[in-house]
């Protein structure tokens, strides 16, 4: 046991290998010690090997079935790994041992709920309520949350009538009044009690007249459909009744523009535009650009605003009128659906001349965006920097400027710009602080800039940082398995669990993964790309920069060592970055195996994204795994059979009966998907040929 405890201490000091060796020795000396097995599980948990940790915990429980600590640690890991059936058993044991703790009852209900047993979850919560001899006080938020959680379980089981009856007692007592009202309206609508549902949604709109979900619910209760022209007159009258209640409300004036057509749309758009232009609302175009998918609406808006621009301003329109109209037209002609950059530049220059403020950078920002769309990234970055200098205390324009600098491949300048708003004392400088803040947009843009410059090591470093951030998000939920139960925030905890299950559907993960996969495919096709494509001058510059960063890294290392020597038990010493340039990432002997680390989550969580399937094809076909490649190709074809990349990949796979892929020094981006081929070293097995032929016959 002493050896096991020493192993635990060594692990906390970062000596993981030594800790495991000592823990194994402890097990060898005392195989039947529950402490040794528990510590062994804790070591595996610290290295994120949850499966082995669970095995160790279970073995420890066999030796000491009454250990609450081991049982608790096991239950937390079962929640982390989504072993809901195992969690039910663990929570039942814990509840039996400590039935007086409310958190144990709640945890048991959650386990049943997540396992899909709604009836058992409700029963557990009811049993606890029956054990209460004194009703909880009105200030007991944990009780109110548990009761509302029980109501949502009943609703999820499909028994909306009983859930609705339960809400009646909650309305006056539950502090989350809005949630109760929303659930009541939802239940009434599902039960087809439309008159009561209409009243419920109108009450919600009295509380928040800008919430579009409430308007959608109200439309359903009235049997109105935006896609049905016969309903448009009634819908227009409905929204007018809400708009007339207050001049400040925007939603009932904006929503009708989505479904109105023809003259009715022109009249409503005219009224809406006149109202917002008189106020000088800068976000008007952002609020209306969704309408541009309808060609007739786009033309109507253009005609109306051009008409405003041609008229002389009057006192009724106010002093902001000309400024707002010209700014709208600048954004209008910059938008990709009606792009005319010459006109956009003309209107933005006129807008800037009308703007008396020397600190309002809004119009200068749009000018830089127009320049960017013209293709002059260097001028756009300079213009955005000029906009930044108009208000040096504004973080948003500072961030925007850094993004434009990255688009212009000015990585060093961009990090200096970002450094104006990062902590000066942060380890690793501005980049280290951005990593701590998990600033994914910067890491992605920085990686893309390095990728364009053929600095693939640094690019991979940035994309891997994003990959690691999602790992951190996944690991962070571990603490909430116990924290949320202690605090009684049950519904938020369940929402978090469901959100974590789809974590890697996040667009930032997908974008970083596609770029990383593309680089690894290039490394497989042509390993010499790891050396980059730099001129002698660029190489000297890179070497000089590397030396400076190495010196800085050594200084940081010494500082970290000094901090470690004087650190207390509460101090956290950051891990040293041994590969700041990403050189080790480029030296991988199996690029496709590294690509699979990014690809597997994509195929699991974003299978409906055609880029995921196309990336999967490129990786699998190079690994000569033709059936998985075929599966990706079929999935991509179902998403969009007319996609050019799908057709090219289909043609390539049809040649696999006679040809195989070999490395090419001219591999292009994944979106090009063009690869050279030569004769097969070995013929494909007959069964694989048959499957490929059968599936390919169904593809265009």
Question: Which residues does each PLM region occupy?
Answer:
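Non-TPR docking regions that flank or precede TPR/alpha-solenoid scaffolds in eukaryotic proteins
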Residues: 1-700
């Amino acid at each position: 046991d002493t050896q096991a405890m020493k192993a635990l201490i060594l692990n906390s000091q970062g000596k993981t290998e030594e800790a495991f060796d000592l823990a194994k020795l402890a097990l060898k000396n005392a195989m039947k010690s529950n402490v040794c097995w528990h510590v062994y599980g804790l070591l595996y948990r610290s290295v994120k090997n949850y499966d082995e940790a669970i095995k160790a915990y279970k073995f420890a429980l066999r030796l000491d079935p009454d250990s609450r600590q081991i049982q608790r640690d096991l239950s937390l890991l079962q929640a982390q790994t989504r072993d809901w059936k195992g969690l039910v058993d663990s929570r039942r044991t814990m509840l039996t041992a400590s039935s007086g703790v409310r958190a144990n009852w709640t945890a048991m209900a959650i386990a049943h709920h997540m396992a899909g047993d709604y009836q058992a979850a409700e029963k557990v919560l009811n049993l606890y309520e029956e054990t209460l001899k004194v009703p909880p006080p009105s200030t007991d938020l944990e009780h109110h949350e548990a009761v509302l959680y029980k109501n949502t379980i009943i609703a999820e089981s499909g028994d909306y009538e009983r859930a609705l009856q339960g809400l009646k007692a909650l309305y006056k007592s539950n502090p989350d009044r809005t949630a109760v009202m929303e659930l009541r309206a939802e239940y009434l609508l599902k039960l087809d009690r439309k008159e009561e549902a209409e009243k419920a949604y109108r009450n919600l709109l009295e509380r928040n007249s800008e919430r579009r979900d409430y308007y959608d619910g109200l439309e359903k209760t009235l049997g109105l459909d935006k896609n049905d022209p016969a309903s448009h007159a009634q819908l227009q009258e409905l929204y007018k009744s809400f708009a007339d209640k207050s001049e400040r409300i925007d939603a009932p004036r904006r929503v009708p523009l989505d479904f109105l057509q023809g003259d009715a749309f022109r009249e409503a758009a005219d009224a809406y535009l006149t109202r917002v232009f008189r106020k000088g609302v800068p976000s008007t175009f952002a609020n209306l650009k969704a309408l541009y998918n309808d060609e007739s609406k786009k033309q109507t808006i253009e005609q109306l605003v051009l008409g405003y621009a041609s008229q002389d301003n009057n006192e009724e329109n106010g002093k902001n009128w000309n400024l707002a109209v010209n700014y709208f037209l600048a954004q209008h002609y910059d938008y990709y659906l009606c792009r005319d950059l010459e006109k956009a530049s003309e209107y933005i220059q006129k807008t800037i001349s009308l703007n008396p403020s020397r600190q309002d950078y809004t119009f200068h920002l749009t000018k830089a965006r127009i320049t960017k769309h013209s293709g002059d990234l260097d001028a756009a970055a300079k213009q955005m920097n000029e906009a930044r200098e108009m208000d040096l205390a504004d973080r948003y324009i500072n961030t925007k400027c850094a993004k434009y600098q990255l688009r212009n491949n000015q990585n060093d300048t961009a990090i200096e710009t970002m450094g104006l708003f990062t902590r000066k004392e942060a380890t690793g400088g501005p980049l280290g602080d951005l990593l701590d803040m998990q600033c994914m947009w910067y890491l992605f843009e920085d990686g893309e800039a390095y990728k364009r410059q053929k600095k693939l090591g640094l690019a991979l470093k940035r994309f891997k940082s994003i990959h690691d951030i999602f790992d951190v998000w996944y690991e962070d939920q571990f603490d909430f398995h116990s924290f949320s139960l202690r605090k009684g925030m049950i519904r938020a905890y369940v929402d978090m669990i469901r959100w974590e299950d789809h974590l890697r559907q996040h667009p930032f993960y997908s974008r970083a993964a596609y770029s990383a996969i593309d680089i690894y495919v290039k490394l497989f096709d042509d390993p010499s790309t790891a050396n980059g494509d730099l001129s002698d001058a660029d190489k000297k510059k890179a070497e000089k920069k590397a030396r400076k960063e190495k010196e800085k890294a050594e200084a940081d290392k010494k500082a970290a060592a000094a901090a470690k020597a004087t650190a207390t038990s509460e101090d956290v010493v950051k891990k040293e970055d041994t590969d700041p340039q990403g050189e080790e990432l480029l030296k991988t002997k199996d690029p496709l195996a590294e690509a699979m680390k990014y690809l597997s989550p994509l195929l699991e969580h974003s299978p409906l994204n055609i880029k995921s399937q196309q990336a999967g094809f490129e990786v699998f076909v190079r690994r000569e795994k033709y059936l998985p490649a075929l599966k990706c190709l079929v999935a991509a074809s179902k998403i969009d059979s007319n996609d050019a990349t799908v057709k090219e990949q289909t043609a390539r796979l049809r040649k696999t009966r006679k040809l195989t892929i070999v490395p090419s020094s001219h591999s292009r981006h994944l979106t090009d998907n063009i690869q050279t081929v030569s004769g097969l070293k070995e013929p494909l097995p007959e069964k694989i040929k048959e499957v490929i032929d059968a599936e390919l016959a169904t593809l265009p």
